[in-house]
Amino acid sequence: MDNIIVAIDGPAGSGKSTIAKLIAKKFNFTYIDTGAMYRMITLYLLENNINFDDLKEIEKALKNINLDMQGDKFYLNDVDVSTKIREKRINENVSKVASIKIVRDNLVNLQRKISNNKNVILDGRDIGTVVFPNAKVKIFLVAAAEERARRRYNEFLEKKVEITYDEVLKSLKERDYIDSTRKESPLKKADEAIELDTTNLTIEDVINFISKKIEKVK
């Protein structure tokens, strides 16, 4: 039987990571958090004072970066950066870094390599359109901006990050704009993807819906 690839795309705060993790656990699939990969690259560039427009320096940097993911733990050159990659400065810059072609090309290759010969579920912005256009299940999660901001704000509160709801909403809308208008792999629904509005759905509702789609292709 062919390996199953499940692609979950959607804007920031639509519930992609939460849902993807739970689905992976339910079906014993490998979960690949592509957003965390871009966050780790963003962290490296910021901490090494590399300008996002300096493509030569970025290309050099990519050769010195080793990413490792173990469950909810993320390692950048063997250092646990799981908390750091969720900081406000990363949120404000990750969409800019994700729009850089050499960064995208590098990470798309890595995502395909990790997924080779496995049943995987990936979440991101361009999984169903660019990374795995032949994925057997493609879901595009959406939700009202205010609801997505509320979810993100609650996540920040749990992590004791000092930020206001209005700041979260503003940042999220800015990311939506950058993600959907960027030249490289813009955020858009794949033609065959099923769009699911999670604004008024529970996590269980969403998992049940996607699970049925996976069962059909198993």
From Swiss-Prot:
It is found in: Cytoplasm. Keywords: ATP-binding, Cytoplasm, Kinase, Nucleotide-binding, Transferase. One of its GO terms (cellular component) is cytosol. One of its GO terms (biological process) is nucleobase-containing small molecule interconversion. Belongs to the cytidylate kinase family. Type 1 subfamily. Its main location: cytoplasm. It is an enzyme of class 2 (transferase). Its EC number is 2.7.4.25. This is Cytidylate kinase. ATP binds at G10, P11, A12, G13, S14, G15, K16, S17, T18. Pfam families: Cytidylate_kin. GO terms for molecular function: (d)CMP kinase activity; ATP binding; CMP kinase activity; dCMP kinase activity. SUPFAM superfamilies: P-loop containing nucleoside triphosphate hydrolases (SSF52540). It comes from the Bacteria.
